[in-house]
Amino acid sequence: MSQTTEKRSRFLHVGGWVAELVLVFVGVYAAFWLNNYQQHQQDAERRDRILASIEKTLREGIESGKINRAEQEREAAEFQRTLDAGEMPPLRPFVFTTDYSPGDFATLLQSGGIQLLDLETRTALRNDESVIRWGLSRMARYQKLSDELIVPNLDQDISFFYDPATKKLRKRFEIYPEALQARVKFANDLERTHTELLKRIQAERQRNH
């Protein structure tokens, strides 16, 4: 075999090896790209499911919250009006019920789901959860005081709760109108943070569609 033929053979061999290497590289890159694309699609679908679920919860909560808040505002305003008029309105058990829980959204966001959301949405979500936690804690405190101070004494004469001379609530029962006002404030705060979070979620969903 001549030197020229040998060089040509060696060149073809090296060329074939390079071509195979390029094909392997292209194949690996294509597989990597496809995997990333599929992962991105899965993340996008998961993010939208999370956002859609939270959006539904918020919409329902805001609507029912408006109805409850209106009733609570009337109750608080009427009690304060009659109290200011010296009519010594009767005290009732303080009750607070809600469908909300700090863990409502946590379940949706477990296993890293929260990392799929925009920073602004995460901030609004944490703010909403903070309002829920703080409000529920305060409502639980008032309900506990009501169960201890008011409920066991509902069969008592009105003078048990009021000073007949001043027609003012006795000191230990002054928490009652405070609790009614706090319940209204919690409802207002909750509607505000729910609305802010809802707007953020709607904006993120629209941007990603």
Q: Predicted segment positions?
A:
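Hydrophobic membrane-insertion alpha-helices, especially the h-region
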Residues: 18-32
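Long, hydrophobic alpha-helical segments that serve as membrane-spanning/inserting helices
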Residues: 1-15, 29, 36-209
